[in-house]
Amino acid sequence: MKLSLESIINDAAAWQAKGVALPKFDIAAMRKRTAETPQWVHFGAGNIFRGFIGSLSQRLLDAGLAETGIIACDTFDFEVIDKIYTANDSLTLNVLLNPDGTTSREVLAGVAEGLKADFSDCAAAERLRAIFRAPSLQMLSFTITEKGYAIRGTDGSLLPVVQSDMTAGPQAPRHVMSITAALLLERFRAGALPMAVVAMDNCSHNGEKLMKAVLEIAEAWVANGLADEGFIAYLKDESKISFPWTMIDKITPRPHPRVEKSLADDGFEGMAPIVTDKKTFIAAFVNAEKPQYLVVEDKFPNGRPALEKAGVYFCDRETVNMTERMKVTTCLNPLHTAMSMYGCLLGYTLICDEMKDEDIVNLVKRLGYVEGLPVVVDPKIVSPKAFIDEVVNDRLPNPFMPDDPRRIATDTSQKVGIRFGETVKSYIAAGKDLNDLVAIPLAIAGWFRYLLAVNDNGEAFEVSPDPLKEEFQSKLAGIVWNDPSSYKGQLSALLANESVFHVDYTKTPLAKRIEEYFVKLLAGPGSARKLLQDELK
């Protein structure tokens, strides 16, 4: 069996015999209607889109709650369209990885068409422009990763490709933000038609990031005489163009060899992953965890699909922000970082294996339930306690989720402030006793100990990339693992760094506790495990 329209229609019984759910709607009719009256375009045609956003479209189509599908575009890696979309008739075999090790399979057909957003191809460019002139278009959504919204480098200067787009104008844009601006200009010229422009990537205030990038490019075009003055007013008028904020949460790892083998063993052809020239790792199937959350600011000037019927939460901007803070400061991200520091020290390479370690599980539970929940931001639409329960009991232990603590340890200096400092600030604001905090100082001491690049057995390891790695390691100079007396107060200056930690720990009793924990972590083989056991009894 090969993933194709012909196969799922003519050999439906064979697919179903292998436990694969099939679409319940007329795919050809949906595609015809989408071509005539497009409603939803998506930029970023990778795995999170195919397995999550594409499945939302399928839910609505299956239930008769939508008549059109999504037009999926890739703005970065055109091989994905040729080798995955076109090769498989724009179908995806979605495999959900259940915590008990079982899987659920479904063919997703919610994508009507796969396009290349390639403005050097006249036909592709005109097809996109025609879609954006359609009065029926309601939404352009994105899953392009956080860096896709960046039009400036780390030094603050414009990326050369963006500078080139600003000078050349909207005819042949190359950067995804320039392409977005060009298509919105097309819509403006077609009668200032309304629509929503929706970032769905996992970054704080994503709608604001998207809006600022598009506006900066548009303003350059106006200044260079390449677009009308009214274009800026159009982009800033929320009754015309909105940039809703969102919170997304779903882990969609690379295609897993075990999943590929199980599909091949069941007679599915063409499931081997490919790696494109741009290093996209992708296959005809997507594997992902079952839990998923999408919270969206309900600001859609031209209407929207009934996605609330597919499990999407719609609310105001403040609730989106609160849901994101709940996840990032309490219910998921702090747990990930704390367990990854000690996971690396204890030699783990899989998060699911860490969840079999009683000492690490005690750290995770203390951090989330005992220290985090009392000051959690409660968005009301999602229960923080239920969210943590799912993380601890289902998501982190899932043996099919091949997540690695070394990946999570990347860029920790950019994360310790939001993931731990905000909870400390909440304790201070509420007048709560900071001496009650054990897991947070353990996590921070664990990070400093991790930066010494020696595990709990005294073996060297490679510290994950981090923009402040060299700076912090240089300030830890002179500290020697297996020699607690080598600590001479080197942490004090670091703990006062409010820009990194979001709080000056030297003005709190926690600095002393972090230093005490750190010294104990220098005591030789087994000291990390002993510290966890002693403090989390």
Predicted regions, residues:
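Substrate/ligand-engaging "lid" and interaction regions
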Residues: 1-43, 47-537
